[in-house]
Design a protein with these regions (language model features):
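N-terminal Sec-pathway targeting helices
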Residues: 1-15, 23-24
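Extracytoplasmic electrostatic interaction patches
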Residues: 100-198
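N-terminal export/targeting and maturation segments
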Residues: 20-91, 100-101
Length: 198
């Protein structure tokens, strides 16, 4: 009787471990530990840059919450990746920047358009964010967003938020330098495989 239970438990453990392996293979990007660390560090700084801009330049915001980092094109040294910030207004509505609005598809926030991630010849991280003028700012050695990388203008973000307000997805969110000082920013550096928009 006890041998039967041992076999059943062994089979269950085998099935569970196999399921865990398959789940990770399907949902987690296949990046090495050094590249994973670079993506997490770089995207945290990008999220701080985007979140700070929205919080400091818009009133009526309760919370800004970031999606996981979606890695969409694997197979080369560096994959395409992006994040999507979701804005919560004071009326309980929420809308995600980068999602399609009627027939308009706004830009996403990620590699190529907002951040450069690489390694230098010595294997050190290279992280560059774009400033308000589109010029790269080296933030490789920064743990938090430095003042020189804080955005004063972000036209694509402004257009996206304006469209979300016009579409009725957000209420009472207005561009104003008073900002929303009490707004909470929730960062997310978890890596996910695939595209959230599909």
């Amino acid at each position: 009787m006890s041998r039967k239970w041992v076999k059943i438990i062994a089979i269950l453990i085998f099935i569970l471990s196999g399921s865990y392996f398959v789940y990770n293979k399907l949902t987690k990007p296949n990046l090495g530990p050094k590249t994973t660390k670079l993506y997490k560090h770089g995207f945290l700084l990008l999220e701080e840059q985007i979140g700070t801009y929205i919080k400091e330049h818009y009133t009526g915001i309760e919370k800004i919450e970031f999606s996981p980092i979606y890695v969409t094109e694997e197979g080369s040294t560096f994959s395409n990746a992006y994040v999507s910030p979701t804005i919560y207004d004071k009326y309980g509505n929420k809308a995600t920047l980068g999602d399609k609005i009627k027939k308009f598809i706004p830009l996403s926030y990620g590699l190529i358009s907002d951040i450069v991630l690489d390694f230098d010849g010595g294997g050190n991280e290279v992280i560059e964010l774009l400033d308000s003028n589109g010029k790269p700012v080296d933030v490789s050695n920064e743990e938090h967003l430095p003042k020189r990388a804080i955005l004063t203008e972000a036209s694509s973000t402004d257009e996206n938020i304006e469209l979300l307000v016009e579409d009725g997805q957000l209420i009472g969110v207005v561009k104003d330098d008073k900002g929303s000082p009490g707004a909470e920013i929730v960062y997310n550096t978890e890596l996910h495989k695939g595209d959230a928009r599909e």
